[in-house]
């Protein structure tokens, strides 16, 4: 996914000309021959829910950014002692790496799922 850093946000997008959050995740995982549902809400039902303390690079991280259901997903890129960094496509900045410690994401964090073994 990191080769897509800087790509713009595009609703429904699945290519370097523009990604939405689930499009970035689907495209990245397809390269590993893993087919995921197209929406972040449906992706949250796939794989094994993991405790935040056991998160690993490649796990999916989910947020409620609109209302009361999961509406945003990213891929964990780095796990540090007190931080988890993830790549995602944000509506305002396109494909970027963010931290779970940023207030916006800290307040909206829901779960982490492992779909890779």
Language model regions located:
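Catalytic cysteine-centered active-site loop
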Residues: 7-57
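Aromatic- and glycine-rich peptidoglycan recognition patches
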Residues: 48-50, 76-117
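Intrinsically disordered, low-complexity
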Residues: 1-7, 115-117
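Substrate-binding/catalytic groove segments of enzymes
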Residues: 34-38, 69, 81-85
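Extracytoplasmic/secreted envelope proteins and their assembly/folding machinery
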Residues: 2, 22-26, 55, 71, ...
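Structural motif
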Residues: 58-59, 75
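Short, Lys/Arg- and Gly-enriched loop/turn segments at beta-strand edges
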Residues: 68-75
């Amino acid at each position: 996914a990191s080769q897509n850093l800087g790509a713009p946000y595009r609703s429904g997008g699945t290519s370097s000309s523009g990604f939405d959050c689930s499009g970035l995740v689907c495209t990245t995982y397809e390269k590993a021959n893993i087919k995921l549902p197209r929406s972040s809400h449906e992706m949250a039902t796939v794989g094994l829910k993991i405790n935040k303390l056991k998160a690993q690079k490649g796990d999916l991280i989910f947020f409620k950014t609109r209302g009361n259901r999961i509406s945003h997903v990213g891929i964990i890129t780095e796990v540090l002692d007190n931080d988890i960094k993830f790549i995602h496509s944000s509506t305002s900045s396109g494909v970027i790496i963010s931290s779970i410690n940023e207030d916006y994401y800290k307040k909206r964090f829901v779960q982490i799922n492992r779909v890779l073994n």
